[in-house]
Swiss-Prot record:
SMART domains: AAA (SM00382). It comes from Staphylococcus aureus (strain MSSA476). This is Nickel import system ATP-binding protein NikE. Belongs to the ABC transporter superfamily. It is a peripheral membrane protein. It is found in: Cell membrane. PROSITE patterns: ABC_TRANSPORTER_2. Part of the ABC transporter complex NikABCDE (Opp2) involved in nickel import. Probably responsible for energy coupling to the transport system. The gene is nikE. It catalyses: Ni(2+)(out) + ATP + H2O = Ni(2+)(in) + ADP + phosphate + H(+). Transmembrane segments: none annotated.
Amino acid sequence: MIELKHVTFGYNKKQMVLQDINITIPDGENVGILGESGCGKSTLASLVLGLFKPAKGEIYLSDNAVLPIFQHPLTSFNPDWTIETSLKEALYYYRGLTDNTAQDQLLLQHLSTFELNAQLLTKLPSEVSGGQLQRFNVMRSLLAQPRVLICDEITSNLDVIAEQNVINILKAQTITNLNHFIVISHDLSVLQRLVNRIIVLKDGMIVDDFAIEELFNVDRHPYTKELVQAFSY
């Protein structure tokens, strides 16, 4: 379970980015955090990851194996390492896998799943496309076998085919390996395909919280309706 109780946070004392956030996420629930840029979505993810401490309130995680997938993959890779080195580091650090043959077999399996060419493993992060690097970014996190996965705008650099491929892979992971799956996004179509619950943030506060089946309910918050209407155009 993940639980946030009366969490408030600001990067300075004069302005709070998040105010009195209360969220409970039971095991097995996939949650989307929806809102415009600057509403506090990424800050909320950083708090759950433990990158920041709340100014007020408490955060409880029943599982410590939490990993993020961020929007900009270039900042997630060592620029001087090949893709292969970065992927194998995850296998060693998170799974204790040192056998090179076993590492190679796992990488080949995942390359096939993500529809990526093995020749790309010898490249530096700067030598592959943004979409390819983002898929490697997702692959590396899944190789680490986290129990909680937090994805922050991970499809922003992907074309529609690669996007659907990654979504299918993540959906399969939520069934087999993940206790919790949190998706930060402004893209409603991505959330509709990945989560079963949506929490809407506006100006650092939760204004709506509902099951995905209730997205078009007449009782939705006016801001949620505004987001839905904007996406439909």
